[in-house]
Amino acid sequence: MLLSGMRESQGTEVSLRTISTQDLRLLVSFAYSGVVRARWPGLLRAAQAALQYQSSSCLDLCQKGLARGLSPARCLALFPMAEAPGLERLWSKARHYLLTHLPAVALCPAFPSLPAACLAELLDSDELHVQEEFEAFVAARCWLAANPETQESEAKALLRCVRFGRMSTRELRRVRAAGLLPPLTPDLLHQLMVEADVPGQERRREPDRALVVIGGDGLRPDMALRQPSRAVWWARAFRCGVGLVRTVEWGQLPALPAPGRFRHGAASLAGSELYVCGGQDFYSHSNTLASTLRWEPSQEDWEEMAPLSQARSLFSLVALDGKLYALGGRHNDVALDSVETYNPELNVWRPAPALPAPCFAHAAAILEGQLYVSGGCGGTGQYLASLMHYDPKLEKPGTFLSPMGVPRAGHVMAALGGRLYVAGGLGETEDLLSFEAYELRTDSWTHLAPLPSPHVGAASAVLQGELLVLGGYSHRTYALSHLIHAYCPGLGRWLCLGTLPRPRAEMPACILTLPAVQHIALVPTPHQTKPAG
């Protein structure tokens, strides 16, 4: 108001008749410090004050803080501010949270206060992410039970947003058993189910970013022998059919140069440039690669860049502060402790401070701008449970933190919601299904719901607030996997999202911005008529 050219900016004094002492103190403090010190409820009040008194920089800061701490109850608390100008970005994130956590949201005491039109819009959205359509019915039933004054016509309009035609026979039996609470009659539910007697419209989610899977160890088209893959796929949409049937629409990007590679690293810079380096192009240790490839949307094919100084496989490649870091790995059956960093502007790899000890088949992730390395195999082949903070700016860059609950290698690690998540891999004697989360503030690990099936040498990515684990193999059976499992922290469970176009293992996955790949044509995938897993 005082700096935007309004009439008050020209006066010698301004009368603020409605501002509270608390709001004035907060805004003046922010004007001098650029900081808002508050927990989530305080941030919400600060955002309301910043919105009312047009402090755009304070509002932006509050929105970032509010978006990081979303929960079912907090999303419902944001709804009264949903249509306020300037809060579109925050409400978009809150709406997405509601769509992906509806079963948990329906259990909140504030859920019945959600307007019927808003709930109907959520239930009718293709973006609604539920394990089965019965969960959408349960949410509608809970809301109607808490709002008995709802007119029958309004209740019918709300229930029509539930896609009964997508339900399996088992789900429909559960719907009939649950019924509707008075004053709504059983005839209303029967009428809606008769109307939906034909298969209903599937739910089709199109992510705002592209999941890309690069190469890997697979099978030849005749399924006779294993063969390193050249294929590069990206997921265009996730589809939910009848019951538990899940499929993924896959597109293809330009293939890797022959003969393909696996046990390699891949990372994205700026969300649009994809780098692939190292790995193996065959199954002998002498087939370890040092080459680096780059692809961006303006290119029809992969471009060869400066090679790694040290050929390596089974290593981690991460992007940090605009550079790439290749950590550890294996060459000629020898574990490596060396680290290299790539400068994309100079197209050169340079040595970085070495790891405290050699390791391969480990995992790495970036959490709050810091690089962490977990597990793997040591120089003598022993399985590691370590977690290390690696700071390339230090002469001795490795700081060991609290170890994982179990030693593992060939696992995945990703940062999500301020925590590090570690899943799957191989233990000292068998496949690991265990799943752990690391809390940085307390330097402690928590065991969570285990993986539904083995994923050794799998790819991982974080997409739309979920941890995705893709492909891999089982050490017990040596069978390759094509399953994609997703973990949603707010619901504490794993869901199967569908399958890869082909079973694959020992490959990486990356996230690219959608405009970078959306012009690439889709490739057909077989129609799936049974649950993926």
From Swiss-Prot:
Stated name of the protein: Kelch-like protein 33
Listed CDD domains: BACK_KLHL33 (cd18472)
Repeat recorded as keyword: yes
PANTHER family: KELCH-LIKE PROTEIN 33 (PTHR45632:SF14), LD33804P (PTHR45632)
Protein encoded by which gene: KLHL33
Keywords: Kelch repeat, Repeat
Pfam family, one: Kelch_1
Keyword Repeat: yes
Source species: Homo sapiens (Human)
Kelch repeat placement: 210-258, 273-322, 323-369, 371-418, 419-465, 467-514
Gene3D superfamilies: 1.25.40.420, Kelch-type beta propeller (2.120.10.80), Potassium Channel Kv1.1, Chain A (3.30.710.10)
